[in-house]
Amino acid sequence: MSIALFDNTPYRTGVDVQLNELLSYKQQEKLQLQPTAKAAYQQLAGNYLAKIKGRGMEFAEVRHYQPGDDVRIIDWSVTARTGKAHTKLFHEEKERPVFILLDLSDSMIFGSQFVFKSVQACHLASLLSWQTKQRGDRLGGIVFNQQQVAELKPRGRSKGLMRFLHESEQLCVKQPFKQSDASQSLLVQLKRLSRLVQTGSQIHLISDFSQLDDACQKILTLINRHNQINAWQISDPLEQLLPQHALKNQLQVNSLQGSGFFKRGASKDYQDAASLRQQKIDNTFIKQGIPLYKVCASLPLMEQFHVPAR
């Protein structure tokens, strides 16, 4: 049974994705959307400033120096060779590489109310992919779960889009793997991304960032130096707050690793630990000047965006 967002954008099962779900976001490709929730660094940043990097500038040609030209763009090698001052001319890049890092690892295979975080992540990645295609930019990225990874070099038009959507469908699994592969950690994928990206790229990181640590932060610093990064955190309400009945009764929890109980009154400790964990994630991106947008798996994706007034 499909859960209709609006128009023809469906969530089918909520535990995995099918290609037609992701293709349906074509109808949103021309909308100038903004997340309803402000980015964390905009709310908390203080003295940290976000880096705003526009499209890169490509070298076009060299011409004779003219009065008023910026001396910083004089081509000194041509000037020395010809004996006359020459200036470099640049134009804005016609297309820009866009990379999406899509985390579908085991911690993302969770959802308490609407869909799994992994499913919501795929829908968000699809929305960003379609808008990338609409702008005429090239799309590449990395899609990974706990045992597999797809590394996609940027391609233009529909080729980059369809490859990315296909890999998203294939790697979005219904249940966690019984044996996890440490070589597919977030840190490993960020290192892979640092080798894949091209200077001046736009990068979208889609994850719950449960594996974010100091080593990841060092790699982010390197990537962020010459690129524009947006971080998208996918979360579920149960990760932040236990159900109300857990305040008075024991709450049984089951997983592949076993089962157990939350003791009565454990809700406060659980909430405090969750808040501390979230604060660390927020602070990591604040220090990097990277916008952190928050998307919840308990609501349809498009309800978490709005079209800004012109």
Please tell me what each predicted stretch does.
Residues 126-129:
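Structured adenosyl-cofactor binding patch, chiefly the S-adenosyl-L-methionine
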Residues 72-82:
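N-terminal low-complexity, intrinsically disordered segments
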